[in-house]
């Protein structure tokens, strides 16, 4: 999994998260999809704050955090959230486990930096995970429903990457991969083909299936 929030490993000086209504509202999604993603993000936000609270408890007792315990808690809580929207298949199970290890490891390494247990980080992670998981769910549902084509829909705003602007509007068979910069992706935020983190982090592009 790509370490999306620590790509540059720099100190965060301003908020990275965006209010959920704005973050998802600007995406080219149906109202139903937007509501699902807002709901997912709100639940995942609570999960992240719970995990940060566990770290705080360990710190208050001047104890070293139990890596395995916190990872297992995050895995279980993430699965509960995702399970409200889809069945947890092998792909999602593996992704959630790798994500959880990554988050806990990064938090332990950066306990002295307030950002890593902040509301902003919780929200930033939550909005990204809503898109990561539900983009995958949407792709699987499109295949099951017999869709055969897909089109990459980019944001076309000042935050958009040039590589995403370039692929925007591209239509290909549903089982083919988009060429995004130097990466191959089945859909936005997909890392199953080894896409670079720089093409995944905070991506708000979407896909239309036909």
List each language-model region with its residue ranges:
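Acidic, glycine-rich two-metal-ion catalytic cores of nucleic acid-processing enzymes
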Residues: 120-210
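N-terminal leader/targeting and assembly helices and adjacent pre-domain segments
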Residues: 1-141, 145, 209-210
